[in-house]
Amino acid sequence: MIAVLQRVSEARVLIEGQIVGEIGAGLLLLLCAERGDSETESDKLLSKVLKLRIFSDAAGKMNHSLQDMDGRGTAGGLLVVSQFTLAADVSGGNRPGFTLAAAPAQGRRLYDHFVAQARRAHPVVRTGQFGADMQVHLVNDGPVTIPLRMAPPAGVAPE
């Protein structure tokens, strides 16, 4: 699975002008399932997202994770947005190819799994809508933007 993690002071996602997910300070996660991914990669990625120490302590050092935030009030939210274009292949020509992304049914299944597990592990999880045309608004804090990838084990054939 591929993700782009952004520390935000606020973020929201809209569909047809309506807010469908919104958080205060926390993390915006753009998420893409790749061919060959399974719940194993999803779970590993979620663990990394929750434990990554990218929030500042009193001394200004990145020492706190999303798990360290209570998720109440305006701090500690996780906004998860599906984005299959993270699997773009731009190696040939000028038009990106998306054959490395999971098929839509598998992508939805893994996205839903990720969100369900996130909701079990963290008190404030909001989402966009899988497959929808969305507008994402965010105020990047820092900025802190980190690409993440949990690849399937070597030898696992793409589906």
UniProtKB/Swiss-Prot annotation:
Where is coiled-coil annotated? none
**Enzyme Commission numbers on file:** 3.1.1.96
Q: Which SUPFAM superfamilies match?
A: DTD-like (SSF69500)
Give compartment(s): Cytoplasm
The alphabetized UniProt keywords are:
Cytoplasm, Hydrolase, RNA-binding, tRNA-binding
Gene3D superfamilies, from UniProt?
A: D-tyrosyl-tRNA(Tyr) deacylase
Reaction(s) this enzyme catalyzes, per UniProt: glycyl-tRNA(Ala) + H2O = tRNA(Ala) + glycine + H(+); a D-aminoacyl-tRNA + H2O = a tRNA + a D-alpha-amino acid + H(+)
Its primary localisation, in coarse terms, equals: cytoplasm
- Disulphide-bonded residues: none
Recorded GO cellular component terms are: cytoplasm
Which Pfam families does the entry link to? Tyr_Deacylase
Q: Where is this motif: Gly-cisPro motif, important for rejection of L-amino acids?
A: 142-143
InterPro entries annotated for this entry? Daa-tRNA_deacyls_DTD, DTD-like_sf
Q: Quick check: keyword Cytoplasm in the entry? A: yes
Which major enzyme category is it? hydrolase
Could you give a GO molecular-function term held by this entry?
D-tyrosyl-tRNA(Tyr) deacylase activity
Subunit text = Homodimer.
Which PANTHER family does this chain map to?
Answer: D-AMINOACYL-TRNA DEACYLASE 1, D-TYROSYL-TRNA TYR DEACYLASE
Q: What is known of its domains?
A: A Gly-cisPro motif from one monomer fits into the active site of the other monomer to allow specific chiral rejection of L-amino acids.
Q: What does the protein in this record do? A: An aminoacyl-tRNA editing enzyme that deacylates mischarged D-aminoacyl-tRNAs. Also deacylates mischarged glycyl-tRNA(Ala), protecting cells against glycine mischarging by AlaRS. Acts via tRNA-based rather than protein-based catalysis; rejects L-amino acids rather than detecting D-amino acids in the active site. By recycling D-aminoacyl-tRNA to D-amino acids and free tRNA molecules, this enzyme counteracts the toxicity associated with the formation of D-aminoacyl-tRNA entities in vivo and helps enforce protein L-homochirality.
Q: Which family does it belong to?
A: Belongs to the DTD family.
The record ties this protein, via HAMAP family, to: Deacylase_Dtd
* Name assigned to this protein: D-aminoacyl-tRNA deacylase
Identify the species of origin: Albidiferax ferrireducens (strain ATCC BAA-621 / DSM 15236 / T118) (Rhodoferax ferrireducens)
Lineage in the entry? Bacteria, Pseudomonadati, Pseudomonadota, Betaproteobacteria, Burkholderiales
UniProt lists the gene as: dtd
